[in-house]
Amino acid sequence: MKKVAVYPGTFDPITFGHIDVINKALKLFDKVIIAASDGANKNYLFNSLERVQLIKKALFVDLKFDKKKIEVISFTSLTTDLCKKYKSNIILRGLRAVSDFEYEFQLAGMNRKLNNNIETIFLMSDVENQIISSRFVKEIVRLKGDIKKFTTKSTIKSLKEKYE
């Protein structure tokens, strides 16, 4: 049986931090479902369709990832329901710093209460990616700064178009 992990997030936009976590996950799982959340309580720069396209371009065009091992979707449901749909009991989350852990710990606990078969696996970003956040990347590009150390070429192009 294939081991499938669900990696939910906003990915607004995808960064090298996210990609670092995806790389690590691909070493542990047969397939990774990258699920761009479309939660109502967030203000997104890119809508869910745009974020799915950005992720696909970053992974499959810029970085040449194996399409057979990754599926990119958007979702509006509970993450636990998404896991059920994809026959996965693994939620994958990336951690950058200790400050991320408290929120992620609570989220993992809630998901476990919703479905006691769910395990949340935390993967640490490499040191050079721990400072990267989508929020900072958007702010840097808005102020006309250089973000090539933080995300892929296609994502940079899309970000610049949004801020023109």
From Swiss-Prot:
GO BP annotation list: coenzyme A biosynthetic process
Known cofactor(s): Mg(2+)
Enzyme class, spelled out: transferase
Residues reported to bind ATP: T10, F11, H18, G94, L95, R96, E104, N129, Q130, I131, I132, S133, S134, R135
Gene3D superfamilies recorded: HUPs (3.40.50.620)
HAMAP family: PPAT_bact
UniProt protein name: Phosphopantetheine adenylyltransferase
Taxonomic source organism: Pelagibacter ubique (strain HTCC1062)
